[in-house]
């Protein structure tokens, strides 16, 4: 039969949207993936539901270039993972506890099976996107202006973020171990590029992509390679010390339990950048099938780039997320007003909070709030310091929180004491 072709102008925003959108921004595959499936006679809906069979068929077609195959496969596996995430099987019903034990056990089994399937899809998406970026005829530097490479970087970053989160849902909110096992794949977690975390327990790894903080004027990010994360450390052992709520007349000469003032708080929420790469792979087949992968955590304050596949690439980072989460979980504004009328026992003595791990090579800026106030008064300034690359490189912020219903001279002495103890 004959096919009639006509031409018409379309809006610029439609053109750009078609070029740049993907399964991450709409319930449809990207135009690049749809084109590959169309020219091979595959249905997008069927391939999204059965990615393994579809990818296996695509591999048998020699006309499909390596970049086309790897990028389409990565998006298909990610599409299936996102579909599973939205399904009822991968969610815990709020009515589950009211059902019989037999039904609860069956639902739990289905829930875990769904998460296992989702983890398998994310594992495949990570591998195919990595192979596209670092093991094709063209390297990343040859595709620097390609929209497709930006899409694949996003697939890679999101797949890592969702893999870590889904693994925590599947195996419970226990402390993060040294590996993540997905079927036959083993992702070993490496903290060599985050010296502070060596030999330290990590309570939680949290992706920051979906975090939004209404009280922050802006979110400070650094564009680059890798998935933006936030690391949560366990509470300090001295958090339950009876000296936290005890008024101490002369803190400079007081003998604290364990020799440390319990009101000095090291940073618990740390910015991190996560990458995933094969431990050893020289071919695309090894990248896709070798079970050994490595998740590397980077300290974005100390590392601006990472060596991936033998070359150095700038690292992404989110510097505002740890500060935003700290503010949200401490509810300091409410405590400030209660302290004014002497109703908050936590503020018998001043507290000092380090917003990042102490770095002796950076100058310390100590911010002290005023009457009936809290460290929330310094949100804009603190976020600006973290957002400016030069200030971030040379300064670190400490926040002091104290009860404002005490005499000014007494408050001044107590604050001076806790600052001195922090440096010691």
Sequence positions of predicted segments:
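Sec-dependent N-terminal signal peptides of Gram-negative exported proteins
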Residues: 1-2, 385
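Flexible, membrane-associating and regulatory peripheral segments of lipid-active enzymes
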Residues: 3-365, 374-380, 396-399
């Amino acid at each position: 039969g004959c096919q009639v072709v006509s031409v018409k102008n379309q809006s610029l925003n439609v053109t750009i949207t078609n070029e740049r959108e993907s399964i991450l921004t709409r319930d449809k595959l990207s135009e690049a993936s749809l084109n590959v499936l169309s020219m091979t006679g595959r249905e997008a809906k069927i391939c999204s539901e059965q990615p393994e069979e579809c990818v296996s068929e695509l591999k048998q077609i020699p006309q499909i270039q390596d970049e086309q195959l790897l990028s389409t496969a990565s998006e298909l596996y990610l599409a299936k993972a996102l579909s599973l995430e939205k399904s009822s099987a991968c969610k815990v019903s709020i009515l589950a506890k009211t059902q019989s034990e037999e039904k609860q056990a069956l639902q739990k089994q289905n829930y875990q099976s769904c998460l296992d399937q989702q983890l398998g899809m994310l594992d495949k998406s990570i591998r195919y996107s990595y192979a596209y970026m670092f093991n094709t005829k063209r390297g990343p530097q040859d595709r620097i202006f390609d929209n497709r490479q930006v899409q694949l970087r996003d697939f890679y970053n999101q797949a890592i973020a969702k893999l870590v989160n889904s693994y925590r849902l599947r195996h419970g909110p226990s402390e993060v171990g040294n590996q993540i096992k997905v079927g036959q794949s083993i992702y070993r977690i490496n903290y060599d590029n985050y010296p502070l975390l060596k030999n330290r327990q990590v309570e939680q790894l949290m992706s920051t992509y979906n975090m939004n903080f209404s009280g922050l004027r802006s979110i400070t990010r650094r564009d680059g390679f890798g998935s933006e994360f936030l690391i949560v450390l366990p509470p300090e052992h001295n958090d339950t010390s009876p000296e936290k709520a005890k008024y101490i007349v002369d803190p400079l000469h007081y003998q604290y339990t364990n020799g440390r003032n319990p009101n000095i708080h090291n940073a618990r929420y740390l910015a991190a950048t996560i990458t995933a790469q094969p431990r050893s792979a020289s071919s695309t087949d090894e990248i896709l099938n070798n079970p050994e992968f490595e998740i590397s955590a980077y300290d974005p304050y100390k590392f601006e780039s990472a060596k991936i596949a033998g070359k150095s690439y700038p690292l992404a980072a989110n510097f505002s997320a740890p500060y935003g989460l700290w503010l949200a979980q401490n509810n300091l504004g409410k405590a400030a007003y209660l302290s004014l009328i002497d109703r908050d026992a936590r503020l018998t003595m001043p507290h000092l909070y380090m917003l990042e791990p102490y770095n002796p090579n950076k100058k310390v800026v100590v911010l002290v709030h005023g009457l009936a106030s809290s460290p929330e008064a310094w949100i804009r300034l603190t976020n600006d310091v973290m957002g400016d690359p030069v200030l971030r490189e040379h300064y670190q912020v400490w926040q002091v929180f104290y009860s404002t219903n005490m005499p000014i001279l007494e408050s001044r002495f107590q604050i001076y004491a806790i600052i001195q103890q922090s440096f010691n």
